[in-house]
Amino acid sequence: MGKIKKIQRKGPPATKRPPKAARTESTDSALGLDAHSDLEKPATSSDDGFEEPTPKPKPSKKTTTLPEPVSIIAQKKNKFRTDDAKNVKPPTLEEMKELRDTRNLFHSNLFKLQVKEMLEELQLKTKYTEYIDNWMESFTVFTQRLKDGLVEKSQLEVPLNVDKKISGFIFSKPTKEPQLIGAASTGTLLGPKIVVDVALEMPKDCLHKDDYLNLIYDQKRALYLTYVTNQMRSDPAYSQDKFAFNYHGNNPLKPVLELTPAAKHVSKHLQLRLFITAPQSTFKPGRFVPWNNNIRPTYYNDEWDEEEALPSTQHYNASVLFDLTLAQNQALLDKAFKGRRNFQDGLLLLKVWLRQRELDRGFTGFGSHILASFIVYLNQQRILHQSSSSYQVARTVWNQLANTDWTNGITLAPASGQTEQLSTIAGYYDVCFMDVSGQLNLCANVPLGVYQRVRAEAKLAVDLLNDMKLNSFPYIFMQKCPLYTRVDNILKITNYSSIQQMLVLHSKPQMKYDFASYGYPQLLQILTELLQKGLKQRVQAILPIETVSSAWPVESKAPIIGQAIQLGLILDPEHAYEVLDKGPSSNDDPEGSAEFRKFWGEKSNLRRFQDGSITEAVVWGTTKDAPSKKRLIVRQIVMHLLEHHLQLDSKDIQYIAAELDLVYQLSPWFKVSKVKTKLELQQDTDAEALSPNVIRCYDDLARQLHALDDLPLEIVSISSISPVSRYCEPMPVLPQARMMADHIHASHIQRVIIQLGQSGKWPNELSALRALKTAFLIEIGEKLKAQCRLNWSITSEGLLVLKRGFCFLLELAHNKELALLKQEVTERGVTKYVDNPESRALEQRHYILPKVSGALHSLHQSHSAYGPTVLIAKRWLATQLLDDGIWPPMATELLVAHLYQQRNAPQAIAAPQTGFMRLLHLLAHSDWNGELFLLNFNSSWQEQQIGDLEHSFRSDRQSYPPLALATSYDQQHAGRLWTTGESPSLRILSHVSRLARHALEMIETSLQSKDLRFVRPAQLFRGSSEGYDLVIQLKSDLVPNALSYDLGSPFVSFDQPNYLLPRAGKDPLAAIVHQLRSAYSDYAAFFYNPHGGKELAIMWRPPAVFAPKAFKVTELQACTLCDKGKVQVVRETLVEDFKVLLKDFYLRISTPEELKREQREHQNPKRYFNAKPQDNESCSKSKKRKLAKAAKVQAPLKRKSLIKSRPLKSLS
């Protein structure tokens, strides 16, 4: 009987805090790697198992001379210093080896400490090892008490669904003791749910020589498991435990018993799984070679030509071989892992890495037992040394995975006579890794796409480890990377009739026999082959997205699984959105042309191209289509293929792609036909498609500015700093800006920074310099009017210029203004230059933002999904009532840029929807206190600079804002420029993390459910009304609606929209909210949707703020006198102050509960009049008709004045 071996680790005991890395169950062991053995031959083994690197010469240090007073002080201090070096003990041999390991293997001591701490937290507690040992002893005694006999009907259902059932099974008690297998045996159990696998071998007496045929072995195995389970339930030792059946690896032929102990101290995190196996000598060795058939067509009542060879059942054969060879394979693993802490820890690291990427799930999963076997293989090949550290083990495995090809086969079996047979066996599988017996392919069920994905992830891990500028630990081990966040599109088919139709009409008989009629792998093969052929280079990978099968009570019937399928498509951004699929020439290759025409059906047409060739081709769109339309080309192709080849209806297919692009589309309420412009605008256009129009207009304006004659100073550079220039403006920018009564009206202004040539004539006084700048701008405006016929208007912020319906705000930047802002004169008359908030804001806007804006524009050019991802993210934050004053827009842009810059996925993000889901994961799981988000644009930051900044961040964390963002252009302000302590605050960050987790829960639930469709945008992009104390409704006719798609308010129903053009650069509501926060942020928090929100939500501070306090002259703001000479802040008084500040915007105030009640009672809140509901109810119908008739004949001017006067009257 196997026992769990207690592992004594050096260092302090594991703490009780929750583990930092995800833990998981598994069936295997540990691992390690040579930091310098990336596919190279292993060098001569040293004492630590890796070649000593050649030491690099140290650069000579520059000597600096201290100023004379300082040097004298230093000498005086040294005079009294004692020489402690003589009292320091030299380092021990173990300490020297540890220091050398840190220098040679790890990036830094931090990475080593993180790995060490994680391994300590993964250590199995003693209470679990003791319980498992005691349970195994008890179970061994139990199996010896079992009695032989005929298995009759019991209360339990046999956990197997087969067409033809056997009868008369005679049970024989085990002749061999139960054994621990997998991770429990090799000492690599992983939590948080610790799963202990136990194998009980069925004796040969239960089986006959012909039981290998037609699923008889599988039925006897299931009957044996059922009998043992029934006996355990009636035994007092297990009667209180919880019993359930489940399918191991989503394989319906592999039922296992899942037992949850009743003992309270282990029941929460411990589960035992019972496997039934058979002796390897039960059947002849050649029965289960891949080319043999062990399920006859007659079993399924199919006819088969006797002269034709029977189809091979290689996958079914591998399923049986798994049981037969389990003991031999486990013995090999135990020999390799037991007593080797380095191998065990290495495998634990690999398990965490694999589980975080969800590549080990389901029928097609790349299980951790494969990784354990691969460690043994590398040890056999002398690529891994027995003394390799755990880090070396993991790194070597990643490196070998990335650089070896298993499609031709590798084997653990002795080399003699295996080469020819190995190549033959490999031809029956996508991936081939033979076990020690040389009969079982450990990767029999792993499809090529999953294997290639594992290789890509392994290569990424090695690249991250090689990047000396990066702390790769969180990216490799800590970040959870669900598979749905790694794919761009998802195909989901859950309709039962569609599944059966595909299996009946399109599954070949050979596939049915090979997988024993299990539908899931057949569907996977049918769909993958079809989509690979149709999409070709448009996709980089097609991956199955599986959910682990759920356990069921032992009294219930075994469920039928595999009746739904979900595939993830990883797109190639370079080819995915091509509008043309060109076939072979009809003259040169008539057969190929006919095949192309047959494959594509009616979509294929004969076309002549500009080069004169005439070929068959399929056109999916035009080159002028908007990017959002082009992102649906792959969806269009997949839907056509499924309909044309598999006869599936579109209503039975869920293709998840670009559902969230809706949020930045133009509102259907706004009619583009009313916009007077020469541009071709479509009603279904969006913010992304409209951005190039603004950029082209800006480019023309920049050329005109450079071409202006007779300017006093030359224009050196012109930079746009508006979000639209970076494709990051979520509101559609239409050419509707107009000049009205000498004022420019526009919903958006595009900010432009102009740098002038050097001159020594600028004044040395700040106000004079700014006056001269204004005069210069006026001259630029006059010349634009005279030479380019452009209208302009001067404001306090700069020069407004109207061009082609777009409004630009020109600002002049001059270094002298920045210097004057920093200038301070001390009491002694000494002039010094000190940073202050105003100077930092000016430096950011005039000098840093233009560079960052250009870098983000370049990022969008290389990753076309970057801009749309920002648009979705900004819309989501706005709908959660987080405006620019709470969450800076640049923080969103830089966080998304961080996602696209960091290499935490093998492939770049091709779909904005996927980018948004990754951003949600970042927001949901980031450690805001410990993470500094670095954006090294153009790799202009050196390794030393990054290290210094990270050291400063860790050592002086309190001087940085809660959300620390740093770009390589920030200079001395790195980490403190884009956010502040209050924008966003730590409380807001926690709030956003909760919102992101909730959004991810909705997304995951919809993806994992067979019945639910993917979440609708209205579910994600509508904030909650919970948690707010008051809601101030604003007059909808004074607050213009946003031009983007309106997904509704969390408080009230839809209202008639208005699209009034405000004065350019004016946002009165944002200004009022800023005033409210400035005056009353100590007493209340204010929230509103900056994208056309009509409500202002208020949340009071804690009650202690409103408690009576002693009278103090300095603390009387918003206070009212109360008893005993004390003062207190009264909420009702604050509300009256809010009304005064809101002035004409205020309509009514209520609580969220009142608004909900009105919605339920269908009493829609009055938006234009602050009238009580009963006022309208008291009116008779005839009176209402008379009022309506009178309103129709009223003059429009009179009606307008009435609408304005009523709310003002109610305020008084």
Curated annotation (Swiss-Prot):
Q: Which Gene3D superfamilies match?
A: 1.10.1410.10, 3.30.70.3030
Compositionally biased tracts (Basic residues): 1197-1212
The processes (GO biological process) annotated in the record are: ribosomal small subunit biogenesis; rRNA processing; tRNA export from nucleus
* Record-annotated disulphide pairs: none
Q: Which GO terms describe its cellular component?
A: condensed nuclear chromosome; CURI complex; small-subunit processome; UTP-C complex
UniProt KW keywords:
Chromosome, Nucleus, RNA-binding
Q: Which InterPro entries match?
A: NOL6/Upt22, Nrap_D1, Nrap_D2, Nrap_D3, Nrap_D4, Nrap_D5, Nrap_D6
* The keyword ATP-binding belongs to this UniProt entry's keyword annotation: no
Q: Report the protein's function.
A: Part of the small subunit (SSU) processome, first precursor of the small eukaryotic ribosomal subunit. During the assembly of the SSU processome in the nucleolus, many ribosome biogenesis factors, an RNA chaperone and ribosomal proteins associate with the nascent pre-rRNA and work in concert to generate RNA folding, modifications, rearrangements and cleavage as well as targeted degradation of pre-ribosomal RNA by the RNA exosome.
Q: State the similarity comment.
A: Belongs to the NRAP family.
What does the record note on quaternary structure?
Part of the small subunit (SSU) processome, composed of more than 70 proteins and the RNA chaperone small nucleolar RNA (snoRNA) U3.
- This protein is called Nucleolar protein 6
User: Source species, please?
Assistant: Drosophila persimilis
